[in-house]
UniProtKB/Swiss-Prot annotation:
Name this polypeptide is given: Aspartate/prephenate aminotransferase
Family classification: Belongs to the class-I pyridoxal-phosphate-dependent aminotransferase family.
Location within or outside the cell: Cytoplasm
Binding-site residues for L-aspartate, renumbered to this chain: 45, 131, 181, 378
Keywords: Aminotransferase, Cytoplasm, Pyridoxal phosphate, Transferase
Major enzyme class: transferase
UniProt function note: Catalyzes the reversible conversion of aspartate and 2-oxoglutarate to glutamate and oxaloacetate. Can also transaminate prephenate in the presence of aspartate.
Primary localization class, coarse: cytoplasm
Annotated site, Important for prephenate aminotransferase activity, chain positions: 18
PTM annotation (N6-(pyridoxal phosphate)lysine): residues: 243
An annotated GO cellular component: cytoplasm
SUPFAM superfamilies linked to this entry: PLP-dependent transferases
Self-association state and partner proteins as the record states: Homodimer.
Amino acid sequence: MSVESFERFLSRRVLSMQESQTMKITGLAKKMQAEGKDVVSLSAGEPDFPTPENVCEAGIEAIRKGFTRYTANSGIPELKKAIIRKLQRDNGLEYAEDEIIVSNGGKQALANTFLALCDEGDEVIVPAPYWVSFPEMARLAEATPVIVETSIETGYKMTPEQLAAAITPKTRILVLNSPSNPSGAVYNEAEVRALMQVIEGKEIFVLSDEMYDMICYGGVRPFSPARIPEMKPWVIVSNGTSKSYSMTGWRIGYLAAPKWIINACDKIQSQTTSNANSIAQKAAVAALDGDQSIVEQRRAEFEKRRDFMFRELNTISGIECTLPEGAFYIFPSIKGLLGKTFGGKVMKDSTDVAEYLLTEHYVATVPGDAFGAPENLRLSYAASIEELAEAVNRIRKAFS
């Protein structure tokens, strides 16, 4: 029997899911680089900086001391306490140890939440552009993603009116990702409070993905909905060490939420992966409790790169950028390029544009289709200024 014949045995939940486009494009770019092609990759969703030395040393020390066995399923107390201190220091949030769970990366923390709260028929409101995994995680939990399209005019932020229109009796979760991957949008306090007023009293949970909270620009700071006392019982805060501390491969994410939700996620995790990596947990303590000046140094470097990309891309005909307030992506509208012919092919959507840039000009980007925004591209500026300048030059040439 062929592979295709056997695929009929796959579950409905798998068949309904899509592969992560960011991982797909990044993998293709790395393959081309391995073949000797001079690809400038702006597709990766991870910092180009190394993990801080003190964090690496903490991991090495954990290995040398034999801290290599199972830990408590929900994380070691030492790390939970460090997370609590971080949330107090950086986010103005107060949590207890039994309101924290440590997971194998932010993805697992988010997936645990959907599995804990959603049943078949429930609806999850997801503003677009969205991180690629949000709708797929909702589907994995047998819920239905309800996509709310935002626009460049609103800075890619959902309005209270849009939220109100999307709510039905089946609404279970509102996903709020601030700073946003892919747009870099950050909801300020007034905007968050306005959204929360719409759902207050409606028994709707808020999944607040705050993974990029320490990478913001121009004095902007994200406001967590968990800071609103009457909403805190309905908010699940998701975060991790991946982005702020360049620890994507260490796989440490966490949730802060009401105890009963944490207990449910703990149960799910105990039957899937068990605890997060013991060595990485020790390293994460060093990251959260160590000298934070390196986080600010790297944030400042990202800001320089953001300013460069915003300035240069906006000089290319057919491309329009908003200024990202956080994260390390720029999400230009390429509406002005669509319908035109480049490289002998009509650019129908962002996938065509991304494929053209990669195959003809060796610049890896991620098509906006993956984020629910077919007229945009996501470009990561987690690369050196020299690499960014080369990428911009190639993009300019591609569309000249």
